Amino acid sequence: MGALDTAVRSGRALYAGISNYGGAQTREAARILKALGTPCLIHQPRYNMLDRAPETGGVLDAIGEAGMGCIPFSPLAQGLLTERYLGGIPDGSRATQGKWLDPKAIDAPLRARLTALGAIAKARGQTLAQMALAWVLRDPRITSALIGASRPEQIEDCVRAANAPKFAAAELAAIDKALAA
């Protein structure tokens, strides 16, 4: 935290932020930086429908308590929360590269959960990607979400999530049920 404070004070950075810290670590980082006079303004955790660790591990609570912004990365779970993998692993996809996405993880049970999520998205008038982004952004502690795209139309699709209708309680319950299957 001292290095972050030094970077801000010396003009090398405009603000301090952290990434991938757990709940307790987030609270401690915020406390230390505040004591140094350099508030921690942003946290960047991995967060999506398939990886809810920031909820269960207290990260979102710590962010809210500290008044930090939150910009999650991988809100589409490296493309899993799109329709791309519903029929299997397409040629040229991340899963074929085996670097960041394990093809063995894209099994029939996962595809069934993704298909169920896709049906919920369709009922909302959205693509699965749009719903997944809207789901991440539903929490007021989330400032924005980092997306990646390999084609312009993917960005256009993701941007539409900004105008998504709010989730009804029944929709959130259906999402939780689909994910638990």
Across the structure, where does each feature detected by a protein language model lie?
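Beta/alpha (TIM)-barrel catalytic core signal, keyed to glycine-rich beta->alpha loops juxtaposed to Asp/Glu
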Residues: 1-180
